[in-house]
Regions:
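Short beta-strand elements bearing conserved aromatic residues within extracellular beta-rich modules
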Residues: 27-30
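Conserved positions within compact, well-structured domain cores
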Residues: 84-298
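Beta-strand-rich modules
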Residues: 48-70
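Pro/Thr/Ser/Gly-rich low-complexity, intrinsically disordered linker/stalk tracts
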Residues: 4-24, 53, 67-84
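Solvent-exposed strand-loop boundary residues in beta-sheet-rich modules
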Residues: 34-36, 67
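Hydrophobic beta-strand positions in extracellular immunoglobulin-like domains
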Residues: 16-18, 32, 63
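Short beta-strand segments within Ig-like beta-sandwich modules, predominantly Fibronectin type-III
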Residues: 36-43
Length: 298
């Protein structure tokens, strides 16, 4: 028996014998557990509707012929119907169960706020190096930092991650990368950031279309900001060594792409937004810089 889960329903496929005990089979009844929801048909597959999204179900099948009903089949493996993901209305959760709204920009689906996860999506911890004022710049594995140590900062701006965390480098020198983003999401490449820039009309206006408006979180003048894309960028600042800087003034987002021409492989591309203009700036910087992370759906 093979089950394919769908929104509030399941398609139950099975090998359908033509007779049972010498008499032709005239129909099949599929029954869910829990709920006892039934559906009938004369061949495989049979679609069972009226299921509750988020509930795990198993299914049994009974065959019917002129003699009567067969015994129920062995129960299937459990399946859980889920609401289909729709970018812009659906949310996505990280391994810490932080929930992120999503926004569709062109054909790209982005998280609408900065990442605030403390683990890679396999459960491996990302060390908190906020207090490591002397050693932050020498790190070559993933690390995170917050600006003030206040929970309210993390809730609003997320963590600042070095590039190694954004790339998923948990062991120095490793080329086997973990994923800091939720399953089916990833840190965008430099090329994917460029696609966003193009979609929004080019670097000279894209930043304004990405920045949240007003001067409550952005410092004045928050030039060019209209947030027409819904990206809702906030000025979380950066982590340098030994401290964090530019909260309210700058938003910086890692790409997953190394700058192969600068820094001997120790630099990577990022995108930056400033309070002063509506530009979307492209630059590269040392991988030990702490910056915000946004995730892009696969």
């Amino acid at each position: 028996m093979c089950i394919r889960d769908r929104n509030s329903s399941a398609s139950v496929a099975f090998v359908a014998p033509t007779n049972n005990g010498g008499s032709s089979i005239t129909g099949y009844t599929v029954t869910s557990s829990p709920g006892g929801i039934t559906a009938t048909g004369t061949t495989s597959p049979i679609n069972v509707t009226g299921l509750t999204n988020g509930t795990a179900y198993t299914f049994t099948i009974v065959a019917t012929n002129a003699i009567g009903n067969s015994s129920p089949s062995t129960a299937s493996s459990a399946v859980t119907p889920l609401v289909p993901f729709t970018c812009g209305t659906s949310t996505v959760a990280d391994i810490d169960v932080n929930s992120y709204n999503t926004v569709l920009i062109g054909t790209q689906c982005w998280t609408k706020s900065n990442l605030k996860v403390t683990k890679y999506n396999d459960g491996t911890a990302i060390p908190d190096e906020t207090a490591n004022t002397a050693g932050w710049a020498g790190l070559t594995t993933g690390a995170r930092s917050d600006y003030t140590g206040a929970a309210s900062y993390i809730a609003t701006y997320g963590y600042l991650y070095n590039w190694y965390a954004a790339k998923g480098v948990s062991t120095s020198g490793s080329t086997t990368y973990k994923n800091i983003c939720p399953t089916d999401w990833h840190v965008p490449t430099d090329g994917e950031w460029t696609a966003l820039e193009t979609q929004l009309g080019g670097f000279s206006v894209a930043g304004g279309k990405m920045k949240s408006t007003g001067t409550t979180l952005w410092n004045s003048p928050n030039g060019g900001a209209n947030n027409s894309s819904g990206f809702s960028a906030l000025p979380g600042g950066q982590r340098l060594s030994p401290a964090s800087v530019d909260i309210g003034n700058e938003a910086s987002f890692w790409s997953a792409t190394t700058d192969v021409t600068t820094g001997g492989g120790g630099w990577a591309w990022f995108r930056g937004l400033s309070r002063l203009s509506g530009f979307l700036n492209i630059a590269s910087t040392s991988k030990d810089m702490g910056q915000s992370v946004r995730c892009l759906k696969d």
